[in-house]
Amino acid sequence: MPEVKSDIEIARAARKQPIMEIGAKLGIPPEHLLPYGHDKAKVSAEFIAAQKTNGNGRLILVTAINPTPAGEGKTTTTVGLGDGLNRIGKKTIVCIREASLGPCFGIKGGAAGGGYAQVVPMEDINLHFTGDFHAITSAHNLLAALIDNHIYWGNEQAIDIRRIAWRRVMDMNDRALRQIIGSLGGVANGYPRETGFDITVASEVMAILCLAADIRDLEKRLGNIIIGYRRDKSPVYARDIKADGAMAVLLKDAMQPNLVQTLENNPAFVHGGPFANIAHGCNSVVATTTALKLADYVVTEAGFGADLGAEKFFDIKCRKAGLKPDAAVVVATVRAIKMNGGVKKDDLGKENLEALRKGCANLGRHVQNVKKFGVPVLVAINHFTSDTEAEIQAIKDYVRTLGSEAVLCRHWAEGSAGIEELAHKVVDLANAGHSQFSPLYPDDMPLFHKIETIAKDIYHASEVIADKLVRDQLRTWEDQGYGHLPICMAKTQYSFSTDPNLRGAPSGHAVPIREVRLAAGAGFVVVITGEIMTMPGLPKVPSSEKIRLNEAGYIEGLF
């Protein structure tokens, strides 16, 4: 049996083209590519603005079933499908998110795909890349510093220090920083107060960068951030302490999309990186809309399962950016479906048709949920060597009962050649005119009813549990003019419920709301459910333990 190469070995052996050549394929002149080395570049804001009058290509969303430790390969399928479409002669750009350092050194892994369906340079993308996350972290923490400084020098805006809503962020998993006391050590250090850190991908600044149309829209949204409240409970905005201009300066370059390439030298935008369990889980609007102006097809992903990423892609990103997806692909694996059917991880390599059929309920619900938005669906079965013909056929037969089609894909092992069939079917579906996209709920629906709609229609919950404080807060925001905003649910990615251990397709459960936060700059209301954390912790054995530099100075153990 031939040796199976690791992702990093495959990526390191890639024959990359100079990034200027990748840009030339899209008609981007060299003077509008801002290079970071030879294999990555930012696309200038001037070039992007000049493409506004171009027509749009077809937009394809890649989503998945609920993630399991067995792995689904959503990013791998996104990249593979992009290569597959280019292989059959369709000019295609892949749009994915940047990786966060926290999960890279924690448990989740990287964001560059896998096997022979990756974007490169993989090591750079998974580590510091072009510095976007540093810029976002800096802009966020500048605002935090300015808030404390404003209070220290007299508090002209009369901010109630008990009601400051802005925490600090860092791009790392660190549970020790979730709740802290700041400004200790005496009068010279300010007013002691309780605060804390979130991970950078949960920052409202990250969401703003990913939803802003251009730099002016970015600055306006930054100014709209609510940093806290006065004693009369009126909001204080970032613009009130004159923070928005300096924050925009820090984000000027980060606002421009990053161009890289796949292993097969096809263009990919990697830009922005909000998580889908604690944020809206989509790459930047600027990257997606620019790609639509430059290509016939754009393949993008939304984080975690369709209950989180796809719902937010449709209800937040598409609603705010005026996007209309033409088709969706739900990624599933035999192994993950069996795990949703009750099989333990160590037994996933054994054929188990009974558990597979039981676990298909999870896949079926995701397919039906996507269809609720009026978007036609295909299922991609991401192939593993342990899959049996009977198991693959059982999934195909089940998906057929849903009125959709499942296609076996071998892109991890074979690259674009292994996903040609799906590429052809995506083209046919996207061009058939079946998409009748519509968000799940209207803008004018009351905020709590929007939450109930998501919980009941997408999660199949029977009720939403919220105390009087939460309901009153939602009504206050409606009175202040924020009732039109969409909802961003913060929920475990492992289940349709708020219990991460409840696999399959549970129904009739309750969704408890722990907290609500107004992201006025980003333009949505965050609803925190269950035990979800906006600052993750590291696992008992973090991935960092395997990462090192070898004798030749190359990185080992990254993936």
From Swiss-Prot:
> Is Ligase there in the keyword field?
yes
The record, for InterPro entries, names:
Formate_THF_ligase, Formate_THF_ligase_CS, P-loop_NTPase
Presence of keyword Kinase: no
Domain of life (superkingdom): Bacteria
Task: Give the GO molecular function terms.
Answer: ATP binding; formate-tetrahydrofolate ligase activity
Which reactions appear under catalytic activity for this entry? Answer: (6S)-5,6,7,8-tetrahydrofolate + formate + ATP = (6R)-10-formyltetrahydrofolate + ADP + phosphate
Q: What is its EC number?
A: 6.3.4.3
Q: Which terms does the UniProt entry file under GO BP?
A: tetrahydrofolate interconversion
Q: Into which family does the record put it?
A: Belongs to the formate--tetrahydrofolate ligase family.
Name of the protein in its database record: Formate--tetrahydrofolate ligase
Q: What gene does the UniProt entry assign to this protein?
A: fhs
